[in-house]
Design a protein with these regions (language model features):
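Boundary of Sec targeting at the N-terminus
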Residues: 21-24
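Short, compact, well-ordered microdomains
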Residues: 115-117, 122-128
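Edge beta-strand at a domain terminus
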Residues: 124-126, 132-148
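Short aromatic-glycine motifs in intrinsically disordered, low-complexity regions
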Residues: 75-81, 128-135
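Central antiparallel beta-sheet cores of small beta-barrel/beta-sandwich binding domains
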Residues: 34-116
Length: 148
């Protein structure tokens, strides 16, 4: 008879501790994985200010023979010819239910800015980032992996 209350208590504690371990915010350092090659491309730090998320490139993973900090030659406006490391590539994202949307993402490879939405997966260990034109169906997604 006493086993039942102990089992219920143990199950309750297990659920509570597993919920504590889940991360519901994308704030932190993320490894951007190239969707074509599957190799790491960059480290991006996502921060929050006044309820909006932004992401800045902290490091590029480049071959030794490549320029280690190339400039964004295809970017327009203020980002034109700025070093890619240090560039804000994600901005204006706001919480939208369990997802994040309403912001933009810059692709330094082509200099284009896209609408963006994001969602956390695998208890906050992965971030699904989608950049698109017009509607989300017309875009591409990448999965970023949490570094810290």
């Amino acid at each position: 008879m006493k086993k039942r209350p102990i089992s219920i208590l143990a199950a309750g504690l297990l659920i509570a501790f597993s919920a504590i371990g889940q991360t519901s915010s994308p704030v932190g350092l993320w490894k951007n994985i190239d969707d074509a090659t599957g190799k790491p491309k960059a480290l991006i730090r996502i921060t929050e200010s006044n309820g909006e998320l932004s992401g800045k490139i902290e490091k590029l993973f480049r071959e030794p023979s490549e320029e280690q900090n190339p400039k964004c030659v295809k970017c327009e406006g203020d980002n034109k010819d700025k070093p890619i490391v240090g560039l804000t590539m994600l901005q204006g994202m706001k919480k939208d239910g369990t997802d994040f949307s309403g912001g933009t993402i810059l692709d330094p490879a082509n200099g284009k800015v896209y609408k963006s939405k994001m969602s956390l997966e695998e208890d906050g260990k992965k971030l699904n980032v989608r950049g698109y034109i017009g509607v989300p169906m017309l875009g591409r997604s990448q999965t970023w992996v949490r570094e810290e």
